[in-house]
Amino acid sequence: MASSDGDRLCRSNAVRRKTTPSYSGQYRTARRSVVVGPPDDSDDSLGYITTVGADSPSPVYADLYFEHKNTTPRVHQPNDSSGSEDDFEDIDEVVAAFREARLRHELVEDAVYENPLSVEKPSRSFTKNAAVKPKLEDSPKRAPPGAGAIASGRPISFSTAPKTATSSWCGPTPSYNKRVFCEAVRRVAAMQAQKAAEAAWNSNPPRNNAELDRLLTGAVIRITVHEGLNLIQAANEADLGEGASVSKRGHNRKTGDLQGGMGNEPMYAQVRKPKSRTDTQTTGRITNRSRARSASRTDTRK
């Protein structure tokens, strides 16, 4: 057993250790407080150990409390700003908690190593060279040559010069013109097929499924593919909805005159000539009106 001098020394040392007490109106209800005294010369060199109960005041300040009954007791509170409840009874619980946390960390590292995209925030080893590695999810796919011009809604046209190739995905001029040609054929074919279908329906509209089958069996839709710039002009007019209002006419390439075409003939793009300012009828009308106005003005003045 420890001597009485050793017990007294243990209490005095424990009191000296509490140098930062805080003022409070209640006693500290500690779950566990262990005060270990220094070893002495006796056989029992572990010192004096005591445990504080939950309902009794701290033994460290018991003497001070009974000496100063009329004053507010200065109770020590632990300097724990986090307010965590992670208290362990013995070292075995600490070791078990540490092993469990290390196991969870290893499992997360294994998952990140197998599939880096499976977690939102990978470890620092994977984000170290994130700026060098290309993005797999956020990088959009580049459109093929000609797709952007077709999807923009602007009039399509053939390209006579290759694009400035800034990356490997940019194709040459033939790829661009091929896509423009296919789009022009699609627009013209759709316009001609719609007109042929409307004509077949209006000639003998079906009233049941049997008549509809006969109409589809007997209907022949003839699609003519134009050549050169006429194809692009017809495709642009079909895209703008102007192809339906233009009358069916053919273009004689030898003479350049406009001739009336048959129903089965292809419809070419028409270029309307603007009226000349030297038109005799227009100038005659203007002169007659001006003369009439000038004559009326002179009559009123007289």
Swiss-Prot record:
Modification note: Highly phosphorylated in the host cell. Packaging is selective for underphosphorylated forms.
GO CC terms of this entry: host cell Golgi apparatus; host cell nucleus; viral tegument
Protein's cellular compartments: Virion tegument; Host cytoplasm; Host nucleus; Host Golgi apparatus
A Pfam family annotated for this UniProt entry: Herpes_UL49_2
Comp. bias intervals (Polar residues): 157-170
Annotated region described as Disordered, given as residue ranges: 1-42, 125-170, 243-302
Region (Interaction with gE): 154-244
Biased composition (Basic and acidic residues): 1-10
Short motif (Nuclear export signal): ranges: 212-224
Keywords for this protein: Host cytoplasm, Host Golgi apparatus, Host nucleus, Phosphoprotein, Virion, Virion tegument
Subunit structure: Interacts with gE (via C-terminus); this interaction is necessary for the recruitment of VP22/ORF9 to the Golgi and its packaging into virions. Interacts with gM (via C-terminus). Interacts with VP16/ORF10; this interaction allows the formation of a tripartite complex composed of VP16/ORF10, VP22/ORF9 and VHS/ORF17. Interacts with the capsid-binding protein ORF44. Interacts with host CGAS.
Sequence similarity: Belongs to the alphaherpesvirinae VP22 tegument protein family.
Function, in words: Tegument protein that plays different roles during the time course of infection. Participates in both the accumulation of viral mRNAs and viral protein translation at late time of infection. Modulates the RNase activity of the virion host shutoff protein ORF17 probably to ensure necessary levels of key cellular mRNAs and proteins. Plays a role in microtubule reorganization that occurs after viral infection by stabilizing microtubule network.
Protein name: Tegument protein VP22
Organism: Varicella-zoster virus (strain Dumas)
